Amino acid sequence: MLPLRIVCPLAMLMILTSGASGQEVDDASFRNLAKQCQMRASVAASSRAIKIKDEAIAQHQAFNGSRVDRTGRIVFFGHSEAESDQELDGNVSARQIPWRQALGYWEKLNDRKIGEGAGGALQVWYYPGALDDDPPSILHRKKMQVQRLLKFISGLDLSQMGPESDDLREALQQSVIRSSISDVAWSAAFVSSIMRAVPLDEKTEFSYDASHVTYITSAIEQSLRDLVGGESTSFYRACDPDTTKPRIGDLFCYHRHIEGTPHPYAQKGPSLFKSLFRDIAKGEEPISHSHCDIVVRVDSDSSKVTVIGGNVQNSVTEKVLNLNERGLLSAAQGNTVCDSYNTDKPTSPGEPNCNLNRQKWFVLLQAAI
């Protein structure tokens, strides 16, 4: 569909309710959206938003996750995704095994167990020739679906191994799953698993997916409907973090297409929120690498907001972000000596990647009331 200028609410409503895309958003519409977002921000969080907060905190505690302070540095190194248990005697519950916890997020995302096909997005990455005595100078990465590997292992005839056959099969299956947890990003699976616990309806309220961009796009579509008084179906709308105060249950999101990465995002205009909002509203796909954290605490007195996200430094991590004097997300995050940490950006000697809080925060997903 060709780009469309908003000319009247009725025409816009017809476009939005039909699920079409390709519309442009003018500055007046952004001002209207800002007012709606600010109005909702002044209302206390709903019971479901509180449940989202409680579940995120519970998962952080269960994972024994990491913590990042307001300077953007890790102050507590929690368990990592591929770790085994930390008990000396090796007798633990499944909740004490970090990689099993991370697998649980995938199972909740897909609403079924790994044995029932929950690992559709999980892959094992491998490099043919990497174990050769004289490996090639350049190794090419290949991927294998976890479900295919698990099916193969299940079909192996291990009867010749005697009483060890069951243990051998279990060890092979767990090794495959454990390596896939390290190979495939699970931050969006973590967020989706939190929403399952509420639960949010997957047909209307939340787009469960292994990619953050999917539910960010759904929130933008809801904001467009809100502009014309359309139906409020999605639990989240997209708001500008520069003009909207956070509440518990909201999500702060950033993108990782920055200068120095293979695919930087070329911002159009002074506002990152408006630039990406417009691009996505027009049906474009300007970003693919993004991350969202769940707001679990807002402390106006100390001008701090605490968020929790999955797969942050390979853990479930709690971060403390700065708010400005107006209670909005501050442009000043962490230690200015450090460049923002970005896995897609190579480290330079002059700018060590050591600040986990200084990111391209571009949207606040605001929870419904």
Language-model features: locations:
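Low-complexity, Gly/Ser/Thr/Pro-rich intrinsically disordered linker/tail segments
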Residues: 306, 311-369
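...with weaker cross-activation on analogous glycine-rich loops/strands in unrelated enzymes
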Residues: 209-313
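Boundary at the C-terminal end of the N-terminal hydrophobic targeting segment
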Residues: 20-24
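Positively charged n-region of N-terminal signal peptides that target proteins for export
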Residues: 1-5
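Short, solvent-exposed loop/turn and secondary-structure capping segments
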Residues: 67-69, 205-207, 263-267, 318-321
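Bacterial N-terminal signal peptides
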Residues: 7-17
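N-terminal capping segments
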Residues: 25-204, 368
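Core nucleotidyl-transferase/polymerase catalytic module
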Residues: 179-188, 200-202, 206-208, 222-237, ...
